[in-house]
Design a protein with these regions (language model features):
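Short cysteine clusters
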Residues: 16-19, 65, 70, 75, ...
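Internal, well-ordered alpha-helical scaffold/interface segments
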Residues: 55, 364-367, 371-377, 381
Length: 460
């Protein structure tokens, strides 16, 4: 049959020039009967098929995507098909996360002489897509605007908000010594912000600046974000455990030089989710002070006093944190924060919630929440691993990945690009979630991509 019964569907095919395209040509020369739904895009190698190509096609309305390359050990570029398989298998597992049926995507091998195999592959895939029917369009999905009140998992370790005065004094002395010895031009830390609830980055250039340094539950920023800006300069940085993972990743990618960075660490007992605190105290004009004692956070706002258990207002990442101490440091102040033996981090509440949704509801969830995105790119700017902001795909016109159209598809595609670019690189610091002014849980995409990557590594 030349065309399957019923209306033609839009199926996109990315075919390797050397093998699969030749196989399709062989099938055509031999006049093998095959469906006509497929629209072929010829590529030099399947390894050149960026996972974002199929993703964009499916998000833009394609009913199916087929990628076909050379057989294993037969690639004209030695390893292109191995790279393709690794990336595209990961993509196939990622598709259900955003509500796309993975059966709409296929990756296979066809050589130039296998005309009959090509006929069988394209016919079987087209029949499968026809059984699934036209793909649901992202923009037509029923939006799910409400974020349910999720049951937060118990923290992996006791969370606190007190500061050890002796450790703080030791940390300040270490920083002063580094500045006085001219080991660094400046040291990055935190200082009190515009009100009692907020902290801001602090650049300590002189020993007297060190007295402004604060440490505690308000130190929510990951200062590792700023390190690539100062590559080639001698700088110091104060880190929490999660921040230090960002430093390690930057070092691994040669985005900073180890000999140029002096790392100061101290045990972290958790940081607060500012939005959670504000939700609990309600509409206030000014937060005058925030202090901590043990596991209790004390907030004074508009002349009223509030008390909260630290575990009720902590960031989600702190509940599952397994690295409260800096994994890399030149100086460490105080005693390390301990984790109970045998403790295993629980699945983040948002991931448990999304795993329980159907494909249709997942698409509706992201359709509803991404609709609130204002494209401010705060998630990108806060991410320690987003280091190509000077040529970001969100702004670039060559290549022209995204338009400036205010549509849910364009907004979602940016977040998917971000998640793909962070595959294997995301440290789980949660800065994208924290920075989003609209409260969109974009970090869940990165967490689920990381989960897929770790599972793939275990299988290999």
């Amino acid at each position: 049959m030349s065309v399957l019964t019923g209306k033609e569907l839009r199926i996109v095919g990315f075919l390797c020039n050397w093998c699969s395209y030749g196989g399709a040509d062989t099938a055509g020369v031999a006049r093998f009967t095959q469906p006509t739904d497929l629209r072929i895009i010829r590529v030099p190698c399947s390894g050149r098929v960026n996972p974002l190509f199929p993703l964009k096609a499916l998000l833009s309305g394609a009913d199916g995507v087929l990628v076909s390359g050379c057989h294993p050990r037969d690639c004209h570029y030695s390893e292109g098909n191995y790279y393709a398989r690794r990336r595209l298998e990961t993509l196939k597992e990622f598709l259900p996360i955003i509500g796309i049926d993975p059966r709409r995507f296929e990756y296979t091998w066809v050589s130039a002489s296998e005309g009959q195999r090509w006929q069988a592959v394209v016919t079987a895939f087209t029949e499968r897509v026809h059984k699934l029917g036209p793909a649901p369009k992202f923009e037509d999905a029923k939006p799910m605007y409400v974020m349910p009140n999720l049951d937060l998992p118990a923290p992996l370790r006791p969370l606190g908000c007190g500061v050890n005065p002796a450790a703080m004094t030791e940390l300040k002395d270490q920083i002063k010594a580094a500045l006085e010895a001219k080991e660094v031009e400046f040291v990055m830390g935190w200082q009190k912000g515009f009100d009692g609830l907020h902290a801001t980055p602090l650049y300590m250039r002189k020993p007297e600046d060190v007295e402004k340094l604060i440490w505690g539950p308000l130190n929510v920023h990951s200062l590792a974000t700023y390190l690539p800006l100062f590559k080639g300069k001698k700088v110091g940085i104060v880190v929490k455990g999660c921040d230090s993972r960002g430093v390690v990743e930057l070092l691994q990618e040669n985005l900073i030089n180890r000999e140029d960075v002096v790392v100061f660490g101290m045990g972290c007992n958790g940081t607060i989710d500012i939005n959670r605190v504000l939700a609990k105290i309600g509409d206030v004009t000014e937060v005058e002070s925030v202090t901590g004692s043990g596991a209790t956070l004390k907030v004074r706002a508009d002349g009223k006093d509030y008390e909260f258990a630290m575990q009720d207002v902590a960031q989600d990442k702190c509940r599952a944190c397994t690295v409260p101490n800096a994994v890399i440091h030149d100086h460490f102040a105080g005693s390390p924060t301990n984790i109970p033996d045998g403790a295993q981090p629980a699945m983040p509440a948002i991931m448990t919630f999304l795993d329980g949704l159907s494909l249709e509801d997942r698409m509706g969830f992201w359709r509803g929440h991404i609709d609130r995105c204002i494209r401010c790119y705060a998630c990108r700017n806060a991410c320690p691993m987003c280091v190509c902001r000077d040529n970001c795909v969100a702004d670039s016109r060559e290549p022209h990945w995204l338009t400036q159209e205010d549509s849910p598809t364009q907004k979602m595609f940016f977040q998917l690009i971000h998640a793909m670019h962070l595959a294997g690189r995301c440290t789980g610091c949660g800065e994208c979630n924290r920075a989003c002014p609209m409260g969109i849980p974009v970090g869940a995409l990165k967490l689920q991509m990381g989960q897929i990557g770790r599972a793939s590594c275990r299988e290999r």
